[in-house]
Amino acid sequence: YDARMYDKPAARLLGAGCDVLKVNNRGHDLVYSQPVGSSPALKLTRGRMGSAYEIVDDCGHDWNAWIDFAVAAGYRRIGIWGHSLGAVKTIYFLATRHDERVRCAIASSPPRFCHRELLDCEAGESFRASYARANALQAAGEPDGLLSATVPTFNLFTARTYLDKYGEHDRYDCLRLLPDVKTPLLVTLGGDERDAQYAELARSGGTRMQSLPGGAFALIPGANHFY
């Protein structure tokens, strides 16, 4: 829900004969609760979900569920499209799962989750402080302890989630992941996006995508993060 950015593209896709399913994932909203059941992911957070509690790697379960749904409905030529963090999840899913049911994909404005870049950015000291706080909570046996951070985005995070997204491992660095994507992929970026997390993509996105089979890059003039 609340996928207004997709309304106009969806209408054009429908007009071109492509069916569209607008969906969400476990990272929607800040915090919400789910019955735990037998889910390992829900047991980990005691049923709490949302952006404050999510682990990005779990996006594989969400993409698999929606792709399974589409296949069960009879679709065989499936494309997926994610925006912002959803774009990071799209690239990560394609790079790590290699699901042959997905014929093509679009990733719009994926922020770069690069630990060193966050330390070196203008607000690097704020990031360093939040990261130290998350590490302290984790070391104290409180991975679900909450912290309010302003870098790279103003939000509430559990220590586990903050370390997962922005840790030294750079697990979700979209630029690091791109060479592992085998699916034809279009990456887009708004020409008016000025956040430091998009600087390297704006600078080298065209070259990087040209080196990938089926890769393409589009810098949209005059577009902000929500196009």
Give the positions of each predicted feature.
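Short, surface-exposed "cap/lid" segments of acyl-processing enzymes
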Residues: Y1-S38
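Active-site signature of alpha/beta-hydrolase-fold catalytic machinery across serine-
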Residues: K8, Y92-T96
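Residue-level detector of anion-binding/catalytic polar loops
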Residues: D19, R76, P184
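Alpha/beta-hydrolase active-site loop
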Residues: S38-A73
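The alpha/beta-hydrolase serine catalytic core
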Residues: S51-D58, E100-I220, N224-Y227
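Short beta-strand immediately N-terminal to the catalytic nucleophile in serine-hydrolase-like folds
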Residues: I80-G82, S108
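Gly/Ala-rich beta-loop-alpha elbow adjacent to hydrolase catalytic centers
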Residues: G82-G86, T90
